[in-house]
Amino acid sequence: NSSRTSSAASDLHGEDMIVTPFAQVLASLRTVRSNVAALAHGAGSATRQALLGTPPQSSQQAAPAEESGLQLAQETLEELDWCLEQLETLQTRRSVGEMASNKFKRMLNRELTHLSETSRSGNQVSEYISQTFLDQQAEVELPAPPTEDHPWPMAQITGLRKSCHTSLPTAAIPRFGVQTDQEEQLAKELEDTNKWGLDVFKVAELSGNRPLTAVIFRVLQERDLLKTFQIPADTLLRYLLTLEGHYHSNVAYHNSIHAADVVQSAHVLLGTPALEAVFTDLEVLAAIFACAIHDVDHPGVSNQFLINTNSELALMYNDSSVLENHHLAVGFKLLQGENCDIFQNLSTKQKLSLRRMVIDMVLATDMSKHMSLLADLKTMVETKKVTSLGVLLLDNYSDRIQVLQSLVHCADLSNPAKPLPLYRQWTERIMAEFFQQGDRERESGLDISPMCDKHTASVEKSQVGFIDYIAHPLWETWADLVHPDAQELLDTLEDNREWYQSRVPCSPPHAIGPDRFKFELTLEETEEEEEEDERH
């Protein structure tokens, strides 16, 4: 069936390429219906006229066999129409999404196995992607709890430290919420707030290292959300400065610059034409707030590191999305500070709705959930295609939050789709953070996590692998959802991939054409694998 089988030479962006199981079922049923109609069409003039909606001129002239065939054809078509109607209106998020997720994981595992066999560095990239994005952890031998000079007390896990900001303006609110003697330069930089590729590093430099405060202050004003939700400017400013103070400036990547970048990226994605007027003001506010708090109080190590070292956080959150749960707890806890409740004028219903959405969005930033999120998004995109809805119709919470979760996840993984100078800075920062974790693991006698060993990691190869297996499939699917709005981002991503590929030591000649990206969501599983899955 053409809906289920794809040629290796097929175009990566082919319109008719359908790979998620649920969308394949719909396409297959449509083909069956079309075939039945065509077969019945040839049964005779009476059948043909009936199928076309016009009665035969003389039903008495029809032979009994033809009458029987006509009745069977009509009943079959009615059954198929009913099935299609049911399937098209089915909420596909859960079990159907799981089907696609499991399929994608099997496909990616095959690709990663091949990659790991190519070289030692290839094996490390493969292990990193598998452990980080596939929710698969190797068996580890847990050490005794390490002795630390300053172990985290339970009190700190639940939230507030003493106020970290040195001063709060009591009179006039600064134009961008931050005290700076470079306000004009900052204003010029923030003119790009609505554009993809804002130099958030420059914003950090010009705002006294308060990029998160400056960016959110600007974004909320740009969207007129302070007025919509009656958020007092002084309350917003106090909360933002407190929130930003709970990001660790000594953490190379997961600091307030990253948070500001994710907020601004999400702001741009929310403004894409395909999503115009799709989301309510409350949903937009929830998305911006989720991005703002999504990495607050990040210690610069991974969830698995916290689990392996028996940390208090892992204990509190039962090893499940440890950091993401902590970011949420801190972000909401800070609202309880003096004059920090930016949601004070929302109704109880609005507060509960916003909280639910923020929790769902931040928990979805756990990278181990990536494949499930991608599978859900891909299924949604393909289902919309095969049901010919044409426009993005999100008429239930499950669909709406799914797109918002994907949007925040895309913003969180937007570095490779940014202009190369920005992408390179982010790469340097994430590798510095990884290597710092690796050093801690080495000192503690732990196995060093993939990509965290500064002596063996290949930075360039890791970025090519990250784009091929994670970023490109995600951004390609997002681009399908908002087509054609994100084509420029996809082009940038592919150009950046080529730049890093050209710098891989002893790299082979560039692959061209459809094989350029090693992992494509168009791979077909063999019958043997399908049978093996059924046995398990």
From Swiss-Prot:
SMART domains: HDc
Binding site residues for Zn(2+) 2: D295
EC code(s) of this entry: 3.1.4.53
Keyword Phosphoprotein recorded: yes
Residues modified to Phosphoserine: S507
Subunit structure: Part of a complex containing AKAP5, ADCY5, ADCY6 and PKD2.
UniProt name for this protein: 3',5'-cyclic-AMP phosphodiesterase 4C
Organism this protein belongs to: Rattus norvegicus
